[in-house]
Amino acid sequence: MSLIYKNIIGSTAVTLIDSYTDGNDSQEIASISLCNTHATDSVDVDLYYHLLEPVYYEPNNWDELENIIYKYHILKNVTIPKGVSIMLSDEYHFKLVSGEYKLYIKLSASDSTVDVIINIK
């Protein structure tokens, strides 16, 4: 098992896991912890991944390759009050396999702060 720690600040989407560049296109996530560390405000969280899937329009014609990106939400506009943590555990079966993908988090406000801990099996 390995752990990924991230301190997220602001409302710009941040990449948490990137199989495009780390070369690991099959990871199983045991858990994801999200903690709102802002002193006074709640935060709305989007947690989602992009899956890159190559599409071939003609068999054996590699010139006609087109990559399509699919977006799948794990959380969408979930409000976390100040000082509260939420835990997404493996009972949700976060198994990201068989493809290139990026896992993202996006917060609702420019001064939002969230700590993320991802436990990879």
Regions found by a protein language model. Give the residues of each.
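C-terminal interaction-tip segments
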Residues: 1-27, 44, 49-57, 97-121
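A structural signal for the main folded, soluble domain(s) of proteins
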Residues: 20-23, 33, 80, 91-92
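Intrinsically disordered, low-complexity Pro/Gly/Ser/Thr-rich segments with frequent PxxP/GP/PP motifs
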Residues: 53-102
